[in-house]
Amino acid sequence: MITIHNLNKRFAEKILFENFNLSISDGEFVVFCGESGCGKTTLLNMIGCLEKPDSGSIIIDGVDIWKTKRKRDLFSYKLGFLFQNFALLEDKTVLQNLKIINKKYRSSMSPEEALEQVGLLDTKDTKVYKLSGGEQQRVALARLMLKQSDVILADEPTGSLDDRNADVVMELLHKINKSGKTVILVTHNDRIISNESRVIKL
């Protein structure tokens, strides 16, 4: 459960959030949408411990994330991130990228199993820089599966992809969500928003 209470955030003279409140239940698929500059990514970053609010609280499973001394543990294990730029080690193979995560988090799933889940097992020995953008984002999704975070924060993950690859990524995100994970997605692309999603217009 994520509870946001009386959240305030401003940049210079621009108020992005004023006494903003929101509750997100475990296992929801939530979409933040709205015009450019409305605060979608800022809100996601505040939930993800990447950007501090001016005041107010963000509570995840009973822990106020901006007051706890266990922020690093929360960041490392509870939250998983999916960005537009993939954040992979391009000079390493697909399998090497996943083994780094598997070793760190001691996942119950093997890297090969994660690759099979995203349909990329045959690329395991390929250097990441040789993959298409859509394939790289699927590797990033396989990495999330290995991390097994309860909350997935996805910031414009289809922003640089064509429609076909965007649809594949969204299908995989919904698959992760249906396994019991909470997914919070930021997008400006109405086309990828599913009827199954809870849409928050900012």
Predicted features by range, described:
Residues 108-123:
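Conserved ABC ATPase "signature" region
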Residues 2, 17-19:
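Conserved structural motif at the start of ABC-family nucleotide-binding domains
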Residues 152-155:
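Catalytic Walker B motif of ABC-type/P-loop ATPase nucleotide-binding domains
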Residues 141:
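Hydrophobic anchor residue at the start of the ABC signature
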Residues 48:
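Helix-to-loop junction immediately C-terminal to a conserved catalytic motif
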Residues 127-131, 135-137:
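Conserved ABC ATPase signature
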Residues 57-73:
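ABC ATPase NBD Q-loop/coupling interface
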